[in-house]
């Protein structure tokens, strides 16, 4: 590397160094600015979180934990990780936090590694009922390495069948029971899960990845008083960078989780991501975050009400969280078709199975909607009522159109863009 090239290495901007990638990122920024994000697992982070994640901490290796690293030069990344840990403990009122997992899936894997042996039995919610891949789906490592007993929801109201959980726990005596899911919109009775676990001597693990921000703000029940261990992502309703975390009130179990994360599953932690987690946790400790989380729930309920008024079914009859799971069968539409037409109209969501869904997993009878991202950009109940009406307009157009919904999509897309421009994001980027 000559001197001129070396000096440019530290000064060239992305637009000059890699224009193709720069343009892709600019296009993604425009997409986020001009579309309404309704994917329940997505959110929009603050400028401060972006800055921390794009900082020089990306250069630093820091295997181990604060004060016990396998590398030198960790004085300042130790500060970042300690801030993240202490803020997480304050946020959730717990005694232990590990902020190193790269994802929620790896946080779950770490708990399995700490508490189970290959071939052990655990219980989790069936993916088809609203669970998660890592809760024992056959295609996932959790379903390959362990014996999985799945529980579901009742046919009549689509709520967790606690009697089934209890009966299966007594029959199969799992070593671990998982509560939580990725498409379950209602409150979960964590105390009842703990009673079931205690009766058979099992650990209770709660995966609150979807609900963490709501839990932190006190608008959704906390699992921490009941669970032996809680895992979560740090994005979704918590509004931080994409990553994972493990929480507990048992420091002795915490030692096992630490060893499972490192050296069990991971090597060097991503210190720039951990710094961004610290920023997000600090933001969530502020009073305005509670108002945000309450708005997330209020907005989701308004959205659900407007969709019902428009002739759609809502799984479980409503929501206690940010998730609105929509059954499209009243309009004779599939989730695959609905996802595509809504995206063409400027609203992104994901196709999702509904309980006892007759369609294939890549087709589905439903879509999953969420309120966190649009609430972050400033949408209130009036805007979510409008969004609900726009969704119905697009879906009704598709139901009438024999597959060509272009006219409705174009008309609604202009309304979506106008609505988004009233609530701009990242004006300085």
UniProtKB/Swiss-Prot annotation:
It is found in: Cytoplasm. Pathway: One-carbon metabolism; tetrahydrofolate interconversion; Amino-acid biosynthesis; glycine biosynthesis; glycine from L-serine: step 1/1. Its EC number is 2.1.2.1. CDD domains: SHMT. GO terms for molecular function: glycine hydroxymethyltransferase activity; pyridoxal phosphate binding. Transmembrane segments: none annotated. Keywords: Amino-acid biosynthesis, Cytoplasm, One-carbon metabolism, Pyridoxal phosphate, Transferase. GO terms for cellular component: cytosol. The record marks 235 as: Plays an important role in substrate specificity. GO terms for biological process: glycine biosynthetic process from serine; tetrahydrofolate interconversion. It holds the Pfam family SHMT. It catalyses: (6R)-5,10-methylene-5,6,7,8-tetrahydrofolate + glycine + H2O = (6S)-5,6,7,8-tetrahydrofolate + L-serine. Its main location: cytoplasm. Its cofactor is pyridoxal 5'-phosphate. The modification N6-(pyridoxal phosphate)lysine is found at residue 236. Gene3D superfamilies: Aspartate Aminotransferase, domain 1 (3.90.1150.10), Type I PLP-dependent aspartate aminotransferase-like (Major domain) (3.40.640.10). PROSITE patterns: SHMT. The keyword Transferase applies. (6S)-5,6,7,8-tetrahydrofolate binds at residues 127, 131-133, 252. Homodimer. PANTHER family: SERINE HYDROXYMETHYLTRANSFERASE, SERINE HYDROXYMETHYLTRANSFERASE 1. Belongs to the SHMT family. Catalyzes the reversible interconversion of serine and glycine with tetrahydrofolate (THF) serving as the one-carbon carrier. This reaction serves as the major source of one-carbon groups required for the biosynthesis of purines, thymidylate, methionine, and other important biomolecules. Also exhibits THF-independent aldolase activity toward beta-hydroxyamino acids, producing glycine and aldehydes, via a retro-aldol mechanism. This is Serine hydroxymethyltransferase. The lineage of its organism: Bacteria, Pseudomonadati, Pseudomonadota, Alphaproteobacteria, Rhodospirillales.
């Amino acid at each position: 590397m000559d001197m001129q090239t070396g000096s440019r290495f530290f000064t060239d901007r992305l637009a000059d160094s890699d224009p193709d990638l720069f343009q892709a990122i600019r296009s993604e920024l425009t997409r986020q600015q001009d579309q309404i994000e309704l994917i329940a697992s997505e959110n929009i982070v603050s400028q401060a979180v972006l800055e921390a994640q794009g900082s020089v901490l990306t250069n630093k290796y820091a295997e181990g934990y604060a004060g016990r690293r396998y590398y030198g030069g960790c004085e300042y990344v130790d500060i970042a990780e300690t801030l993240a840990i202490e803020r997480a403990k304050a946020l959730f009122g717990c005694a232990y936090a590990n902020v190193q997992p790269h994802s929620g899936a790896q946080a779950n894997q770490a708990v399995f590694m700490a508490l189970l042996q290959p071939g052990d039995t655990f219980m989790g919610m069936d993916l088809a009922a609203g669970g998660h891949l890592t809760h024992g789906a056959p295609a996932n490592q959790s379903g390959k390495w362990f014996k999985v007993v799945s529980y579901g929801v009742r046919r009549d109201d689509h709520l967790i069948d606690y009697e089934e959980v209890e009966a299966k726990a007594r029959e199969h005596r799992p070593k671990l029971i998982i509560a939580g899911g990725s498409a379950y919109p209602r409150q979960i009775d964590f105390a009842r899960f703990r009673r079931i676990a205690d009766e058979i001597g099992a650990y209770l693990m709660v995966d609150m990845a979807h609900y963490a921000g709501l839990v932190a703000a006190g608008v959704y029940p906390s699992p921490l008083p009941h669970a032996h261990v809680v895992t979560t992502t740090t994005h979704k309703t918590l509004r931080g960078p994409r990553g994972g975390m493990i929480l507990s009130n048992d420091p002795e179990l915490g030692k096992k989780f630490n060893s499972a994360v490192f050296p069990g599953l991971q090597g060097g932690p991503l210190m720039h991501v951990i710094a961004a987690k610290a920023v997000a946790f600090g933001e969530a400790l502020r009073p305005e975050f509670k108002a945000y989380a309450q708005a997330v729930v209020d907005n989701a309920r308004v959205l659900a009400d407007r969709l019902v008024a428009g002739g759609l079914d809502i799984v479980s009859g409503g929501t206690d969280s940010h998730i609105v799971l929509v059954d499209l069968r009243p309009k004779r539409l599939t989730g695959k078709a609905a996802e595509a037409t809504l995206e063409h109209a400027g609203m992104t969501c994901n196709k999702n199975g509904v309980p006892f869904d007759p369609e294939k997993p890549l087709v589905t009878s439903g879509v999953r909607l969420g309120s966190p991202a649009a609430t972050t950009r400033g949408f209130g109940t009036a805007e979510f009522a409008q969004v609900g009406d726009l969704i119905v307009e697009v879906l009704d157009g598709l139901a009438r159109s024999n597959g060509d919904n272009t006219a409705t999509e174009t008309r609604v897309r202009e309304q979506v863009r106008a609505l988004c421009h009233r609530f701009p994001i990242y004006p300085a980027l």
